[in-house]
């Protein structure tokens, strides 16, 4: 058989030829001309993901990759060496890009402002450089989360107060999952799309377009080690799924991995508040708002148990929030346990 006799379906060729860069440009056709910088921003995010993925693939072979730095971050959490590396990668990739004016990370107390001697853009990148970094030392999946917002006002006082806005202000959001393959999932507000990094090409190639989360799914993902620290409503919900067939518990300790599973298979991710931390653990600007943006674009639902996550307005950059994210029916079910419990308390 000659090469000319080999039949390759056009659909396969189209998908194989659709890089992240090409796809983003297609998505931006419906945007104004002033939004074209978003394509370059996405390319830079992809570059950061490639650099982090390469580092992770050699984590057990290189020095200064595994373990802790001995420092704590703004949340009082011990900082892993990969946290520092990944955060520095994002800064290095964007510092002289001329695309952003600030980078806000959960690893930094205040945003990083692009120096005046560098070209300065009008967008802000908010990100969690490495989510689930405790998994790095044992070779389990981790991820990066990102969101893009446009600067509003001049921010002359360096307070970044314009970032204290609801999640609907996000122009784009996504995550990169570092697992058996490296997957980038993003949305510009018109569907959710996933790309797999082809190591031989060094390109993110379209894997799935217009992802739709099932309306109901079998997965419930939560750390049941906190069971006795939750409100009674959440304990009642957990007892409910224990008693009913068709539910499966899956929890990896990496938010991106758990959300990706639910996006693909359906179900619900829960990180409620506890007696010790009533506002939960997850950061609104860097974690839950970007993921809520994605899940809603895929037809899902995201709330703090009472309010839509994208409606929440933070009062500080590192504000935390409880999170219930996933299939619409499953999130509504959890919310119903919470509302019923409040009604009983009211009576």
From Swiss-Prot:
Binds 2 magnesium ions per subunit. The gene is fbp. HAMAP family: FBPase_class1. Belongs to the FBPase class 1 family. GO terms for molecular function: fructose 1,6-bisphosphate 1-phosphatase activity; magnesium ion binding. It comes from Synechocystis sp. (strain ATCC 27184 / PCC 6803 / Kazusa). Homotetramer. This is Fructose-1,6-bisphosphatase class 1. Keywords: Calvin cycle, Carbohydrate metabolism, Cytoplasm, Hydrolase, Magnesium, Metal-binding.
């Amino acid at each position: 058989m000659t090469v000319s006799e080999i039949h390759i379906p056009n659909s396969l060729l189209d998908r194989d030829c659709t890089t992240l860069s090409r796809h983003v440009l297609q998505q931006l056709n419906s945007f104004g001309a002033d939004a074209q910088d978003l394509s370059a921003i996405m390319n830079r995010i992809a570059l950061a993901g490639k650099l982090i993925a390469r580092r992770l693939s050699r984590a057990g072979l290189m020095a200064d990759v595994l373990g802790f730095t001995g420092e704590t971050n703004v949340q009082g959490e011990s900082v892993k060496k990969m946290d520092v590396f990944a955060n520095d990668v994002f800064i290095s990739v964007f510092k002289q890009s001329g695309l952003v004016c600030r980078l806000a990370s959960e690893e930094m107390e205040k945003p990083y402002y692009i120096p005046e001697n560098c070209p300065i853009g009008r967008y802000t990148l908010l990100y969690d450089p490495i989510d689930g970094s405790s998994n790095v030392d044992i070779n389990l999946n981790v991820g990066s989360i990102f969101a893009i917002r446009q600067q509003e006002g001049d921010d002359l006082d360096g307070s970044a107060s314009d970032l204290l806005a609801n999640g609907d202000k996000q122009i784009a959001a996504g995550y990169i999952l570092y697992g058996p393959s490296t997957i980038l999932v993003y949305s510009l507000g018109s569907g959710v799309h996933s790309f797999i990094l082809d190591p031989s090409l060094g390109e993110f190639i379209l894997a799935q377009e217009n992802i739709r989360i099932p309306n109901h799914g079998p997965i419930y993902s939560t750390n049941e080690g906190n069971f006795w620290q939750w409100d009674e409503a959440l304990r009642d919900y957990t007892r409910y799924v224990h008693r009913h067939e068709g539910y499966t518990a899956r929890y990896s300790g990496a938010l991106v991995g758990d959300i990706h599973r639910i996006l693909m298979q359906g179900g619900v991710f829960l990180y409620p508040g506890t007696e010790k931390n009533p506002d939960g653990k997850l950061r609104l600007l860097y974690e839950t708002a970007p993921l809520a943006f994605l899940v809603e674009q895929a037809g899902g639902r995201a709330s703090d148990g009472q309010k839509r996550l994208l409606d929440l307005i933070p009062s500080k950059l590192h504000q935390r929030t409880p999170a219930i994210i996933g299939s619409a029916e499953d999130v509504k079910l959890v919310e119903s346990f919470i509302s019923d419990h409040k009604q009983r308390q009211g009576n």
